[in-house]
């Protein structure tokens, strides 16, 4: 999705700001076979090269993941992090803040430091106290935690990362281009986790508020907010919920407000405590207890490390994973 936003060209699944290969009659939009696999200049790159603007990326996924990569790298395979990461490091981005501390190659880190960048890995205070203009600050080995699960002493919020990036980038009198992504809204949707979706979307909303606050004060800044593709099909009013239109707001949403962890956070918590604590965990972090059927389903999950059921007897038909 971001490849199309950044380049103005239609794309194919897995391509990172790269001209798509011609697929004959299957192409909805005509393509030039001679241009297949050519790198496509992104808005971010054009802002730097043609207008001298500063550029930055803020996100919560790992930095070579699709959206940050679509702004600042080129590949016909989004999974080739070993191709993408060095491109991003050598693209002279002024500010990069997000996940993926383990994915920055040694050569790329040396290049950044040799060119005057502050490079911080899992160092929230280092990021906060750095007075230089150019900076990479990466947290977690790969993606950062969902906002609801986040330890604020270890990982900054999307809003804080946005404010830091704007403060540094706005020093350039020629202006700046900054891409901010609430990366895991989409991930929660893929996981059918409404709590993760809602809370990370609210975290993104607060980051948008920081951007709009600056834009109002500055008077010369455009803020554009766009969605990723939709997925999971979350809805209110399916046939599984007759009479939904007569339910109160609390009946529809109150249970969500009791959750203190996302589905991912729950999985980690349950795997870190003995099986005897499962019901206590659900009472404390979700406001309800599991039924006997639900507890049996949990115990049969193939990824549940503390299940009393032998692994060879788990992951049976109809059972899932954490």
Please state what every model-predicted region is.
Residues 1-79:
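Active-site nucleophile/metal-coordination loop of metallo-enzymes that catalyze phosphate/sulfate
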Residues 1-3, 65-322:
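A post-motif C-terminal structural segment
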